[in-house]
């Protein structure tokens, strides 16, 4: 589980990349201590032993979401 620190996020170009196996996911938006968060939960692959159990969590606060939108807009040339 991780609250993503977008301030220190850097691009790393790799020599070898792979497409990962698809996994089910959901998202939630919530407020805590006056801050709004966007959270993505993944549930692992279909062959996973414990179906439906959260595998990974990524949380973004409002500032991180703004930086992510800017980054995606640049990288995908929207």
What are these regions (language model features)?
Residues 1-78:
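Positively charged, low-complexity terminal tracts
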């Amino acid at each position: 589980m991780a609250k993503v620190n977008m301030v220190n996020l850097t691009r790393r170009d790799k020599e070898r990349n792979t497409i990962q196996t698809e996994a089910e996911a959901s998202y939630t938006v919530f407020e805590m201590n006056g801050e709004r968060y966007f959270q993505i939960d993944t549930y692992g692959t279909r062959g996973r032993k414990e179906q439906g159990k959260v595998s990974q969590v990524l949380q973004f606060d409002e500032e991180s979401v703004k930086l992510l939108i800017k980054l995606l807009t640049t990288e995908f040339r929207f």
